[in-house]
Amino acid sequence: MKVLIIEDETAAALNLRSLLGHEFPEVEIVAMTESIVETAEWFAAGGSPDLVFMDI
C-alpha cells in the first residue's frame, strides 16, 4: 500500500513514518509533504497514493 503523509510538524511525520514501518512493513511511504503547494506539486507530477494521512 502506497501512503502519502501531509504534515507540517516534522516530528509528527517522522513518528508516523516510524510507526507505520514497524507495525505495517508492507506499507510504502511514497512521499512526505509539508504544505498544500508541495502536495499539489507532488500530485501534479503523477503521485498516486492509496492512503493519505493529513495533519496528524
Mark where each language-model region is.
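A generic structural motif
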Residues: 24-30
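Alpha-helical interaction/dimerization surfaces of two-component signaling modules
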Residues: 19-23
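Conserved acidic carboxylate
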Residues: 7
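Active-site residues of response regulator receiver
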Residues: 55
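Acidic, metal-coordinating helix/loop segments flanking the phosphotransfer/catalytic sites
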Residues: 17, 32-51
